[in-house]
Amino acid sequence: MELVVGRVAKSHGIKGEIVVEVRTDEPEDRFAVGAVLRGHKPREQTVSTYTVEAARDHSGRLLLRLEGVSDRTAADALRGTLFVIDSAELEPSDDPDEFYDHELEGLSVRLADGTEVGTVIEVLHSAAGELLSIRRAGDQSGELLVPFVAAIVTSVSVADGVALIDPPEGLLDPDFGESADGK
């Protein structure tokens, strides 16, 4: 399975540097000098390889200089490029409570009594923490956002394809978070 570890947001300066939106927990390894990156534009099949020539932090953003990308025009041509890895390249975690996003996506979400809630469709990362985006099961339409914290997500079994949750009262209600006037 192909996983996105970064995306070229834009060029930076006139010497071919690019700004990368990091989508990995290990940017210091993935984007280290000498690292070979595989990248492609969204919805394109052709994958190109790039070697990192220089990497630095600038105002909280990752800037890269890649071999063969020596000016702003070449850097601009990379805008939107997705840097990818194969999930088989990931090191298995030694921590039983640590998961990669792709391991959680597709899990069946159930209550402790076995009642099916839905399926994890995405893991959202926010300043407040991770959220599981869950497509509701059965005839219930919509999406639920469940904080991925131990107090709510009580058990995850990737092998069994199941996450058990113990939601606080109201979290599963369709109108949770809406005001009385429906806004």
Curated annotation (Swiss-Prot):
It comes from the Bacteria. InterPro entries: PRC-brl_dom, PRC_barrel-like_sf, RimM, RimM_N, RimM_N_sf, Transl_B-barrel_sf. Its main location: cytoplasm. Pfam families: PRC, RimM. It is found in: Cytoplasm. PANTHER family: RIBOSOME MATURATION FACTOR RIMM. HAMAP family: Ribosome_mat_RimM. Binds ribosomal protein uS19. The PRC barrel domain binds ribosomal protein uS19. An accessory protein needed during the final step in the assembly of 30S ribosomal subunit, possibly for assembly of the head region. Essential for efficient processing of 16S rRNA. May be needed both before and after RbfA during the maturation of 16S rRNA. It has affinity for free ribosomal 30S subunits but not for 70S ribosomes. This is Ribosome maturation factor RimM. It comes from Rhodococcus jostii (strain RHA1). The gene is rimM.
